[in-house]
Each structure stands twice: as C-alpha cells, then as structure tokens.
Amino acid sequence: DITDTASIQKLIHNCDAIIHTAAIAATGKKSIPLIKATNALGTKLILELSVQAKLDPIIYVSSQSVLHPPPDGKYTNSCPISPNLLGAYAESKAEGEQLARNFQEQGKPIVIVWPSGIIGPDDVGVSVAANGIARLLKSPILPLPKTGGILMHDVRDLSKVLCKSLSSGLGPRRFGVFGHYLNWAETENFLNEVTGRKIRTVRLPNAVFHALGRFGDALSHLHVNFPLDLATARFMTTLVPGDDKSTRESLSLEWRPLSDSFKDTLLWLTRKGMLSKESIPAIFNSPK
C-alpha cells in the first residue's frame, strides 16, 4: 500500500535503491477519486522515506502527460511541468514530479523518467493502451481527429532504461522515453500495414471529437463504459513528437521498431482472447 507509511518503510528496509512505478493509471470520471487519493500521496511518501533512508538512486517513473503541452512543440528532457495539465491523472503525476524536482534541486539522487504511451506483450494486467488497441481493431469504424497522433514505445525498452538508471553515485538525472510519433494519417497507414487489413476510419473535426469525450464523461456518471473521455480526447488532438536522443545516447540504447512492438502486442492480445486471429491476417496468414 503506497499510501501507508509503515508498509513503505517495511518495503525499503535494507534496500540500496528503489524504482517507483506504482500508480492508478486509468481514464474516465469514475477513476478520479481513486487517482487523487493514491498517486500524489503515494509518491510523496515513497520519495520522502527513500530520501530519509539515503537510497541511491531513487527512480520516479513520471509521465509524458506531465509535460503536455510542451512549450516548444516537442517533449524533451528539459521541459517544465506544464501549467495546462489535461485530467486528474496528469495532475496527480505532476504533483509527485514537483516534489521529485524539489529533491533534485537539493542534490538528492532522484531520477525522473517520462514514458509516453507504453505497449508490448505480457502485461500483468491489461493496460489502457492495450485495451484501446483491442477495442479499435474490433470497431467497425474508427473515428479519428484532424490533428495530433500517437506517441508510443515498447515496455521492454522502458525496462532497459530503468535498469540502466540504477547506477548509484550519479546524482539527479532526467530521462525522456518518448519513442515513436505518428500523426493520424500515418497511424491509419501503419495499422493497415501491421494488421494486413483495411481499417475503416472517419476523420472528425476536433470539436466533434471533443464533444464525444464530453459525452463519455456524462455517461461515466451513469456507470456506462464509453471508450473516450474529454481529457483523452484533448490529449489525442494535441499530441506532438518528442526528442529523446539525449536519453538514448546517455544510456547507449536504441528503441525497437514500432511495428515489432505492435506485432508482439497483437499476438499477446490474441493469446489473452481479446483479439481474433482473423482480425490481424498479416500476422497469422503470412508465410511461415
């Protein structure tokens, strides 16, 4: 329980370092109370107790949403926390990151890592991104906005970043893991190629796309599950590329191709029973 001091103290006893990834990562209005009650407080306790215990390094996995929208139209390792955050999740992560940055200014060995959208196989649950991929490939028609796009990377690349960040004695550091950006036209072509079938899409004005998000928020109050909320809709229409070259150079890494990540994710989703083999003929009907 990351909101319980005794639980955390027991966890970090005799530890040299810590990686803090735990958070409520969900969308929709019904998730807001749990997000607010868990993320910021949990991060505060973990960072403060880890600093007191003199752990090195103390790795805080933040979120690229904390930097959105970036001031210069691109996410970088030098971006400030955004003053115009979209949604309760971003707000909760920003509150934790502000504390992490304060500790960095004091010279504490805090490492801040910003993942973008995370995909890949073998999730211990089924993430928001994986659910979204399964849902869109089962949809008869996919509504897309006019602007924005997707920004994604592979969970296995993120794990390498976290492992390589575990060296002690290096002080405060910041690593963006922004990955691959595709605008919506590129995303449509990419999905057609990686699945081997024509994805039917309809391009909507951003105002209409945002209205769908508001509709989703309204339905959530009635406990009706809808695949879009306003914060997500706004995020999707304003997403921009990131520059993580300094991260890759510092840690001697290169990100795996997005097509490989998607194919592995789709194979895993079929094993989970969330997608049919017929929905991705490029993988299951290709020559052996």
Regions found by a protein language model. Name each.
Residues I2-L41, L49:
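NAD(P)H-binding glycine-rich loop region in Rossmannoid oxidoreductase-like domains
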Residues D4, L41-L45, P57, E95-G96, ...:
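Conserved cofactor-binding/catalytic machinery of classical short-chain dehydrogenase/reductase
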Residues L41-Y89, V111:
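Conserved Rossmann-fold NAD(P)-dependent oxidoreductase catalytic core, especially the SDR/UDP-sugar
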Residues L86, S116-V126, L144-R156:
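Glycine-rich "substrate-gating" loop/helix at the edge of Rossmann-like oxidoreductase active sites
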Residues Q98-D122:
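Conserved beta-loop-beta element that borders a ligand/cofactor-binding pocket
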Residues G132-H153, D157, V161-S165, G169:
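A conserved pocket-lining segment of Rossmann-fold NAD(P)-dependent short-chain dehydrogenase/reductase
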Residues V161-L228, D244, R256-K288:
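Mid/C-terminal beta-alpha module of Rossmann-like enzyme folds, strongest
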